[in-house]
């Protein structure tokens, strides 16, 4: 999709949402995590399926990426999408756009060994368009506000 196509689509959608704000809120398709074996899960939704697992030191088999990896992947792609969208709105053609999300895990927290342990937030110097992309990323906003979603849990 060209920059101009993106710009026109966003412009048209923005006009619609300005005139009819109720149309801006949509329900996302459900995602269901089903236990496969051990700590491996199959996540399925209307558009596909992925697998997760944990590393052996945590009791998994490392047969797939961890849930945290998918969170970082979603955050990186959502921020990149918002940056590209903003650039298109401003008529800027990007020759290169890469977003890298770094994190550090202290496994004492997830294991319940030290509840004060929280992941460190990496420091980065961001340009205005990157800041805008991060602030407007639906994934980043959801994570920051803690309004994750409605969860339905079935045990058996």
Regions found by a protein language model. Name each.
Residues 1-73, 83-156:
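Extended beta-strand/beta-hairpin segments
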